[in-house]
Amino acid sequence: TARPDRADRALDRDRAVSPYALPDGNVQIAFSGGRTSAYMLHQILETNGPLPERVCVSFQNTGREMPQTLDFIQECSQRWDVPVVWLEYQPEAPRFQIVNHNSAARDGEPFEALVRKKRYLPNRVARFCTAELKAHCASRYARSLGWEAWFNCIGIRADEQRRISAQPLKERYQHWRPLVAAGVSKRDVSAFWRRQPFDLRLQNINGRTPLGNCDGCFLKSEANRAALARDHPERYAWWVRMEAMNDSTFRPAEPYKQL
């Protein structure tokens, strides 16, 4: 019939003008498990329809994400019918492993394995945790697919330009930031989730999620880390244990045990 043809033509037009239209070539979509990256994934799916084989959606689990984050990723995958590859760092070759919602680490095991291998703690200057647990883990998986080059799709909004870094010179991927091109702000993301039948079950404070990503990250404010210690002492204890194990601190002269 003619109706599918009209729908296909409309989709082609949307792809031609939309900032969410997939670029040519291989694409790795980074899904952090937060509201912004989930919104980005939704918009990409709305524009392009089912993703072709040259596109993969991946989540790199550090083991320090809140359980609600893991559940949210799984729910997005199921509701939107999009496969998500769950990855974790491992110290042995190929230095990543594929897991799933059921088998994913929930007590910082990948993070601890990295700290034990490095024999020192990451900090605000040497953020090897982000590099190894997230970026390099994703790149190693992409290389395992036989990809020589690809686009790395990341969920940075137009209102957080300070987070935009220069293109890494030695990497095989190019950054793709559709939310920046679309002019998306945190207000847009919050408005989207108010309209949805489900949401990330973590507190949203003016577009920010204090317990998002790594629960006790040393880049978070003292107030956020103190709230974790107060409300989730069993989770906060992991950060204290890492400092004791290394006889060092994540932040200079600010040991976690003193909060």
Model-identified regions with their sequence ranges:
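Nucleotide-activated chemistry modules centered on ATP-dependent adenylation/adenylyltransferase
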Residues: 1-259
